[in-house]
């Protein structure tokens, strides 16, 4: 084929265009314009890393500042973990105007949820402890009522025994008063002298004491006692005046006597016993005796 016979007039002129060339309104290529490229080549690899670190540092500081602002608006404190997390999310997901507000709001919600969960757990534990205390209180109440019931029963028994003792003493005293009079003892004549005549002298033998009325308390010999012993003797005498059995009083130790008859009760009876005062003191001593029995039962 001859080169002179080829006709290129029908070819599209776009094929002749350069990718970087502009076009006129008639579709023909215009002046070629080249885009600007950064042709600065770092001298070393360290220069390139310094440029990247500089940009990263500035963006991290911006994230921290925005995070501080968002946290301040919602009243929470920014921690290192929050800052590192926000910077990592910024590099991976990007950042817009409300991103950190949502980030701080999410942290606030999570914190509140954890606090509420802990509060609910603490309240449940508190309810369990309250139930345990109620059960223990109920048990203590039952034990106290049982102890009070026993003390009342013992008090009634003691009062009955005191009444029996009083009746026995009164019966014994009545028997002594109603006993027949002592017969006239024989007169023994003693001759003093012939000139003085005879004089009569009556020698009365000693009166026998009923063995049932003898007790260790009444048979104690008189001795020099200390002030503590004299006070204890006064307390024992007060118990006897209150119709306590003498033999039982003799078996009490000084500690028991002081427990039954404290010094204030002895002082109350110092001016004498009226019927009302006697009953009052007797009731207090009975209550002390009940408490003593309860202590002995508990210790055993």
UniProtKB/Swiss-Prot annotation:
Residues 40-53 have a biased composition (Basic and acidic residues). Keywords: Chaperone, Host cytoplasm, Phosphoprotein, Viral RNA replication, Virion. One of its GO terms (cellular component) is virion component. Pfam families: LNYV_PP_C. Residues 1-12 have a biased composition (Polar residues). The keyword Transmembrane helix does not apply. The keyword DNA damage does not apply. Coiled coil: none annotated. Residues 1-59 are annotated as: Disordered. Transmembrane segments: none annotated. Phosphorylated by host kinases. InterPro entries: PP_C_cytorhabdovirus. It is found in: Virion; Host cytoplasm. Non catalytic polymerase cofactor and regulatory protein that plays a role in viral transcription and replication. Stabilizes the RNA polymerase L to the N-RNA template and binds the soluble protein N, preventing it from encapsidating non-genomic RNA. Homotrimer when phosphorylated. This trimer is stabilized by binding to the L protein. Binds soluble protein N, and ribonucleocapsid. This is Phosphoprotein. It comes from Lettuce necrotic yellows virus (isolate 318).
């Amino acid at each position: 084929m001859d080169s002179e016979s080829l006709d290129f007039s029908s070819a599209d002129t776009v094929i002749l265009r350069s990718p970087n060339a502009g076009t006129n309104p008639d579709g023909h290529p215009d002046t070629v314009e080249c885009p600007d490229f950064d042709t600065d080549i770092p001298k070393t690899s360290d220069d390139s890393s310094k440029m990247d670190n500089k940009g990263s540092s500035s963006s991290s500081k911006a994230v921290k500042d925005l995070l501080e602002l968002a946290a301040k608006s919602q009243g929470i404190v920014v921690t290192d973990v929050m800052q590192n997390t926000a910077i990592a999310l910024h590099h991976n997901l990007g950042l817009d105007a409300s991103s950190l507000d949502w980030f701080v709001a999410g942290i606030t919600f999570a914190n509140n949820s954890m606090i509420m969960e802990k509060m609910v757990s603490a309240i449940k534990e508190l309810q369990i402890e309250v139930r345990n205390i109620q059960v223990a209180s109920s048990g203590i109440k039952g034990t106290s009522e049982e102890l009070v019931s026993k003390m009342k029963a013992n008090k009634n028994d003691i009062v009955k025994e005191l009444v029996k003792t009083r009746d026995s003493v009164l019966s014994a005293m009545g028997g002594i008063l109603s006993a027949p009079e002592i017969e006239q003892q024989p007169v023994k004549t003693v001759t003093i002298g012939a000139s003085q005549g005879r004089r009569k002298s009556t020698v009365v033998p000693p009166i026998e004491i009923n063995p049932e009325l003898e007790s260790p308390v009444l048979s104690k010999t008189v001795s020099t006692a200390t002030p503590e012993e004299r006070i204890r003797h006064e307390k024992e005498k007060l118990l006897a005046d209150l119709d306590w059995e003498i033999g039982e009083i003799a078996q009490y130790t000084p500690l028991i006597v002081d427990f039954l008859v404290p010094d204030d009760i002895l002082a109350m009876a110092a001016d004498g016993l009226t019927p009302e005062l006697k009953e009052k003191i007797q009731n207090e001593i009975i209550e002390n005796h009940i408490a003593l029995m309860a202590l002995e039962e508990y210790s055993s």
